[in-house]
Structures are given as C-alpha cells and as structure tokens.
Amino acid sequence: MNVYRCPVCGYLQLGEKDFHFCPVCKTPAESFYRDPTMERSANWDTKSRMMIQHMAKTGHYFLEGKGTTRQFLNMDDLLFMPGQIATPPLLDDIPVKAEVVLGKNSPQAILLKTPILNAGMSFGALSREAKIALAKASRMVGGIANTGEGGMLDEEREFAEKITLQYASGRFGADESRLTQADMIEIKISQGAKPGMGGKLPGKKVTEEIARIRQIPSGKMAESPSRHKDIETPEDLSKKIAWLREITGGKPISLKFVGGHLEKDLDAIFSQANIPDVLVIDGGEGGTGAAPVFTKDHVGLPLVYSLPTVADYLRKNGLREKVTLIATGGIRHSGDVAKAIALGAEAVYMAGALKIAMGCKYIRECHLGTCPYGIATQDTRLRKRLDVENAAQRIANFIRAATDEVKTIARICGKNDIHKLNKDDLRAINSELARVTGVETASGGVE
C-alpha cells in the first residue's frame, strides 16, 4: 500500500492520492510526497514513534496543540439536495433568515445575527491581542464572544457587544462580580480534546496580567480539576443552574459537554427542576491549546455520532422550544455549519477556523507558547506580530462570508430560513454515515 506524507505537518495518507487537502493542516494534496520508508511499517508512523520516545525519555504523556490528527467519520460525505422542479430554489433577492436566540424562555434572551459563534478560548492559551480581536469581531458580525475558562479581560467586555463567561472547574475569574458582567454563563463540564481531564497552565505562562484575570498567584502553575468539585450529582447541577440564574438576574445558562453516555447524561440533565437554556455538544475532534494525544485520539465521540442523538432527544422530549442546541468540535467551513444545522443544531462554535482567519498557520506549537503569529503565546515580542484591528476584520470577514454561504445553501434548498434545513435536505454517500445520522443514502433508504 502506498503511503503519502504531508510536507507541512507530517500527516500520513494510506492508499491512493484521492483527496484534495491534508485533513490536518489543509496543505494541497499535490504537495504530498510518497514515503516508501513508511510503506514497510505503516502502523509505526512517525507520530507514534515520537510519542513513545518522548514517554521513554520523560516518563510523561505527550502533549500537543490543536485537535486530533486522526481521521474520524465526519460530515464530508453528506451532500445537500438542490431544489429543482418539485421544490425550486429561491430567487436571489429573497431574504434568508439566520438569526439565533440564546435563552428562548429567558428574561434576558440574546438575539444573534449569525449562527457562527466564538468558541471558548482562554486568555493564557491565547494572547491578549488575539482575545481582543475575537471580541471586536463578534461585535462586527452581531455574534457573541466567549471568555474560555481563563476569566474575562476588561477589554473583552469593552469591545464585545455580547459575551459568554465560561464557568469551568477551575473557576478562574468567575466570582460574582464577573459573572454579573456576562450576557450568558456557560457551565463547562468537559471539552472534546480532553474530556474528564482538568487543565494545567505552566507557571512561566502565568504572567501578572493572567494571574490578575484568573485571580491566582503569578508565576505558579494554574491547575483546574477534572470536574466541578461541587457538582457531583444531577441535583447539584440543577442547584448550580438555579444559583447562576439568580445572581445574574435570569441571564441564559449554557451547559457544555462531550459525547459519551449520551442518553444517560441527557436524562440526568433534563430530569431536574432547573435545566440549561443552551446545550453545547462538543465532538472528540475539538481542539485546545494543549492536550494529551491519547485523549484527543481515543476518548470522546466524534461530533457526527453525538449531534444527531442529542438533537433527536431534544425533539422527542419537547425541548426544542426551550433549549438552543450548539454544535462544536472540528467545524471548519460553511458546509459543516449548514450540515450541523440540518442535523439539528441551531448554531455552531468555531475556534480553529477563527484562529486561521486571523493568521494561524496551524503549526501545532500552541502548547509551547512559541506561536510565531502572536496568537497562542504570551511572549511580548511575538505578540507584537498580531495586528489586532486587521485580525478582527479578517475574522469578521470570514464569519460574514460563511454565514452568507449557509444562507445560500438554504436558498438552494428552497428554504427562507437556515433553521428550516433538516435531514430531508441531505443525502449520505457513505453507508456508515447514513446509519449514525439517520440521513438517507443517495441510493435511497437509511442503512
């Protein structure tokens, strides 16, 4: 079997060169070269050997930035069925709605102009400049910024019209005064890159400013536990939701979790007196500033398996009018956004795509703090390389263009609202994908 190597990130493609881009760093397939040395030992790829050598030398697991490099089943083999005769496409001048409501029954509901929202990326993992650019871009497009688990920068609150404060297990910068400044609170149970694990920010990255925002000592490692210590039962979660609603005056409360024992987890969440206004399902493809490769590659369900299950649960239990569903984890472009919506999401979180829009070249050095583009670093010399205004404009341009593309897909399908897209508008050209999503195959029927 032939093995082709990406010259940029080292990804190995087994088989023929029947693809267009590297699934990891998006290098064109034409740049891949055949690697005969790997053809003799395809199972022992460079990354596996490198991880073994690292573990043997240090006695610790191998950390890496971004998401998994594994190729999980994704939405690429779902295709939209264009309207033709029976259901014609809409004319170009017919407007298509794309607004999203967070907190449908909340006294402080949030109306957004785009379904493409900022995922949680913390100050510490990202530079101050990157965080400000994301906040400014969210205002430009009528979206909502997200603090991530590292607390809220004053400038984030200043420049973002709407902002979500992430309430994670470390509770960094999440005292009552900050909670009341946010427009939505997101209880982070877990994330796709490292579900069931806490986080560690090395002491050398805990600058005085980061320490002030996170409300921790400077120069010392910032650690968050594997779970919320005061949320041990579904009842505890219900009480936490009620408390957060009370202190914020009824602002929307979001809950973020990863695909695992989905039905049991959903029953545990929605059998309680207090339920979230927004539910975020994160796929195992989700990226992060630093995570062990073994969790990224082997723990947590990919989004395409989780999203349809969660969406069907909400529909069957009459929760669609109460809960807004957000999908995240490896969402790359408008095709992914539109397909996620057709599978039941009302909005998506993007992280990697927004960093690429502002200048990230995906070299996977996020965890080292040496990002040469000034995005995932606290090095003052490197941070100067990121032009905040230009980065904000580029992010906004991308979100606007991608939102327009999603609207166009809806128009092609004869829909005047992106939220009218559904499984009937899709066909699968992969039988496994048809089976897990409930979408008909292109040849007819659900596998």
Q: What are the language-model segments listed below?
A:
Residues 228-383:
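Glycine-rich phosphate/ribose-binding loops and adjacent secondary-structure elements
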Residues 10, 34-87, 298, 309-322, ...:
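Alpha/beta catalytic cores of nucleotide-metabolism and tRNA/nucleoside-modifying enzymes
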Residues 14-21:
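Short linker/helix segments within small regulatory modules
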Residues 112-117, 195, 213-226, 246-249, ...:
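Gly-rich Lys/Arg/Thr-decorated short loops/hinges at beta-loop-alpha junctions or inter-strand turns
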Residues 2, 18, 367:
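Short metal-coordination and nucleic-acid-contact micro-motifs, chiefly zinc-binding Cys/His arrays
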Residues 25-34:
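Short Cys/His-rich micro-motifs in 6-15 aa windows
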Residues 33-116, 120-139, 143-144, 151-152, ...:
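Conserved, well-structured core domains of diverse proteins
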Residues 5, 21, 370:
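The −1 position to Zn-ligating cysteines in a subset of zinc-ribbon hairpins
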